[in-house]
């Protein structure tokens, strides 16, 4: 199975056609892959396996949003979602202890979320101050 995140909207200055969220592609050996399901998620900027057959989807928007999907046969269903104070969420990784670390580009923060048997909870946000070499992007 292959998961592909597609941005659902773009800024007006970027001439691109919006995607539909998350497309799931399945195939059997020797067969052509096909998209059988589309999960509606706003601007999924990063997808990451949860270690149990499901995955997390990160929404890159004006507020941080993490969505957890659980497998259901050949597709997935929505399990839980948690919002957090951050802008421009762009990457996540999952620790063996089921802590989810989320980097947020625009707000310059790192958000830590715990997954306690399917219950998502924001446990910490780290704030960074200063800037990088390209001042116009900070």
Put a short name on every predicted segment.
Residues 3-16, 57-61, 102-106:
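Conserved beta-strand positions in repeat-built beta-propeller and related beta-rich domains
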Residues 22, 63-66, 108-111:
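Structural signal for beta-propeller blades
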Residues 15, 31-38, 118-126:
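Extended intrinsically disordered, low-complexity coil regions enriched in Ser, Thr, Gly, Ala
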Residues 27-30, 70-74, 115-118:
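Short loop/turn segments that connect beta-strands within beta-propeller blades
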Residues 11-28:
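Blade/loop signatures of beta-propeller domains
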């Amino acid at each position: 199975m292959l998961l592909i995140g597609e941005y659902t909207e773009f800024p007006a200055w970027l001439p691109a056609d919006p995607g539909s969220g998350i497309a799931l592609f399945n195939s059997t050996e020797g067969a052509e892959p096909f998209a059988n399901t589309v999960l509606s998620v706003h601007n999924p900027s990063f997808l990451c396996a949860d270690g149990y057959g499901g995955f997390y989807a990160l929404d890159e928007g004006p507020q941080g949003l993490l969505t957890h999907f659980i497998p259901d046969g050949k597709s997935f269903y929505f399990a839980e979602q948690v919002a957090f104070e951050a802008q421009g969420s762009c990457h996540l990784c999952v620790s063996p202890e089921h802590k989810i670390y989320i980097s947020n580009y625009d707000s310059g923060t790192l958000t830590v979320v715990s997954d306690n048997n399917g219950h998502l909870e924001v446990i910490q946000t780290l704030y960074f101050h200063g800037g990088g070499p390209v001042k116009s992007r900070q």
